[in-house]
Amino acid sequence: DVLQVQSDYSNTFNWGGKKHAVLTGVDYYDDDAKRNQNYANTTPRPTTTVGTPDNGVGVADGRAPVQWNTFQARNVGLYFQDTISLTDTLKLVAGLRYDDFKASYRNPNGSLSSDRSDSLFSPRAGLIFQPDALSSYYLSYGTSYNTSGDTYQFSPGLSNSTARSANTPAEKSRNIEIGGKFELFERRALLGVAAFYSEKYNERNTDPDTAAQQELLSGKRHAAGMEFNLAGRMTPKWEVFFNHTWIPDAKIDQSNVARNSTGTGAQVQGDRPGLTPKHSGSFWSTYAVTSSVRVGAGLTYRGKQNPEGQRSYYASGFSTVDAMVEYAFDEKTSLKLNVSNLFDRVYADALYRGFYTPGAARSVQVTLKTRF
């Protein structure tokens, strides 16, 4: 069960001879979950003779009863941000977020196996330069945390009682970004270009000396690249939506994970992190052929990548094509045909260490829409 509540307050005022735009608020998150462990049947399988299946031979169910591990977490967040107009063209952005996080884990017997409590501050700052009404440039710096008290970091396999990850402080990340936004084609379209450098430090790694009991905040990784976004009307009849992420540089800078003798296993220091393709993005475009007929097509693409935690496997890059045609009977009623994955491409959508989830096959959808 998940409960989430958020409340914001914003206002603008003049103080100290400067204009201030303030955003502040509070959010609350409560998560109550259960996780069970999978137990295989340990009873030996008897032999039987082909052609005589009904000979009384059976297999007893030797699986252990399901054991539930309970996870409970609560987080209260407070945040404040002020955008100060230093001049008519230059703005300073400064903000701070505070999180109070608590989590507990209980084993199948109901006793407390582990708990975690963190008080975290996340500052951010930036500059915005707007030389005219059609363009703006920005520089930003921000930090964030990834607490070790979450359901998927719970390690029930350790005697069903010890969550080693829960005893590890939060991971930290920081991001630096510089970019610009530009209004084009008589303000019908918006172009965004940004360069970024993201770094995760204090990354969780298994302690090689006490691997069964502890994890260390000894890892570090980074990624650097650029993002491109374009959305809007190139002409009154032609719409384009495009985004592309290019990450030429990504590396695990520090790790105590050792490369095994066969060169397989988890990524090690110097490797490119998993789930980090060099190129990914999408493109979609529509064109009004007549006042009643509109056609569209686009593609989604992603480059080659490894799953997280496995350096010897990878999924090849792929692209899928979508298409659309729409007919408007009048201003209120329209009929639209969408075809997703037009060429029925087989690809790996989600990657894991031992398997992958295939992407959706070709699908056709017809939508009749009317307004009253």
Language-model features: locations:
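Structural signature of Gram-negative outer-membrane beta-barrels, strongest in the C-terminal barrel
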Residues: 19-23, 27-29, 69-200, 233-235, ...
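Gram-negative outer-membrane beta-barrel transporters
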Residues: 88, 192-199, 217-309, 343
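Residues that define the transmembrane beta-barrel architecture of outer-membrane proteins
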Residues: 1-3, 72-76, 117-121, 172-176, ...
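C-terminal beta-signal and adjacent terminal beta-strands/loops
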Residues: 300-308, 326-372
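Residues on the lipid-exposed face of transmembrane beta-strands in outer-membrane beta-barrel proteins
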Residues: 5-11, 78-84, 125-129, 178-182, ...
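Outer-membrane beta-barrel translocator domains and adjoining extracellular loop/strand segments
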Residues: 34-41, 104-111, 149-158, 203-212, ...
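Surface-exposed loop/turn segments flanking beta-strands in extracellular/periplasmic regions
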Residues: 35-67, 114-115, 157-166, 210-217, ...
